[in-house]
Amino acid sequence: FFASCDGNDKEDVNPAELNSVIVNYSFIQSDDVVDFYDVIVSYGIDEEEANCDTVGFDGWTMEINYGVGEPTVPNKVYCKAIMTPKAQLPTIDLEKKYSFKVDYNMNVIGCRNDGQTTILKMVSNTNPNIANMPGNKVQEYLDKGEQIIVDFSHEIK
């Protein structure tokens, strides 16, 4: 008679099933974005109310482990970042080149019951087309108003 190390009274656990999900978000933006825009990131899971943070000069990074100690892994993770022109804008120097660049990375990693991890989704982007904007184009860019940087969601399967 042989007994398993973790006991026979436990329910059978599927080793490949996810027991938690780690989500990494990061945003890095140029100083001009921070000077001219308010950048707000909202993030969360499923249909829960979003958490909101402001992105500053140092950027914004968040790592969240969903599912640990919870009865289930979330069905969906999401993150949305919006930049809105500030109410009080700095003076635009028409001779200067401006950079309205925002880089972001988002990774969703599944942690399985057997201890293995798997990448469920990876997203990264940069917008180099607005890295060298002439000063005489800045007001036109600001007049676009609120801009969505990213609207990301991923269903966990």
Positions of the model-derived regions?
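Noncatalytic modules at the cell exterior or secretory-pathway interfaces
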Residues: 17-29, 72-83
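Intrinsic-disorder/low-complexity, polar/charged segments enriched in Ser/Thr/Lys/Arg/Asp/Glu/Gln
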Residues: 20-22, 59-63, 78, 147-151
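Exposed beta-strand and adjacent loop surfaces of beta-rich binding modules
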Residues: 20-22, 36-40, 97-103
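Calcium-regulated, polybasic anionic-phospholipid
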Residues: 28-54
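Tryptophan-paired
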Residues: 44-85
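Extracytoplasmic electrostatic interaction patches
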Residues: 75-157
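Bacterial Sec-dependent N-terminal signal peptides
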Residues: 1-24
